[in-house]
Amino acid sequence: MEYVLETNALIKSYRGYTALGGLDMRVPRGAVYGLVGRNGAGKTTLIRIICGLQAPTGGGYTLYGVKNTDRAIRKSRRRIGAVVEMPSIYSDMTAEENIRMQYRVLGVPSYDGAAGLLRLVGLDGTGKKKVRNFSLGMRQRLGIAVALAGDPDLLVLDEPVNGLDPQGIIEMRELILKLNRERGITVLISSHILDELSRLATHYGFIDGGRMVKEISAEELERAARKCMSLRVSDTVPLVPVLDRLGAEYTVISGNEVKLYTPMPVCVLSDELSGVGCRLLNVTEQDESLESFYMELLGGERHA
């Protein structure tokens, strides 16, 4: 498998704080790679290093086979388009003027591609409308159009649907999928909206505390998903000893929710709980989702 990006024991430290603590990561060519982690896990720091906005303290990475210490890394970085944190756009310009400005920055001799980029992101009808009058979703799509001005092979997006309304989220999803499937652009997405990420990603990287906990493909995740029962109870504190006594495998999700992986008649469970003063509020059968996999991997306490 060919990888467009590989990190090797990547470290980024600040005064008294380590943002990345030896992170290893591999992004396959043509993938939509979802970077998953809590706020403060190191996602944005990683993206800023990849884009050349920060330098690593230790370790390294390769981008299209070129090491970050090689002088040729600047040429490899030109194959990246990125929207990090907020789109780098000018609010007193039109959408087309923003793209033309990026062409000038990149040294592109012709503006002929501007109209095509606006059509691609669904902003071709904005005309003379200033960006300050755009919705957040329109601004995000313009940010992607600006990132595409250099005709990149890798698109890096930091929280691209954050703050968008449902329609804006749908439009962003369709755009990302179009860029990946029709143009063959590899996409690296950092997001905490796991349900939306599960509709996009072909591969996932779960990071916590500045380290890679697990990398897995969407197909592997689907195979690993198991049926379970989601139990909502009045309090998980009295529930846990009951499940331990019954030899059940489970994950505590919150103070009133548990994922139960061991098949068990609801009537038996209800009787057991009534004896310890715990009320069973709701039971639903479900397959493990990206969210439950994440909770099990990083956020929940697993028992077996």
Task: Cite the ranges covered by each PLM segment.
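ABC transporter nucleotide-binding domain
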Residues: R173-Y261
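ABC transporter nucleotide-binding domains
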Residues: E2-L5, K12-I189, L194-D208, M212-K214
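Generic beta-strand hydrophobic packing signal
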Residues: N8-L10, L23, T251, V283
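Non-catalytic surface loops within mature trypsin-like serine protease
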Residues: R29, G125, L142, D235, ...
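Short, Lys/Arg-enriched, disordered terminal segments
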Residues: M1-Y3, G300-A304
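Short, charged/small-residue-rich alpha-helical element at the C-terminal edge
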Residues: K227-L297, A304
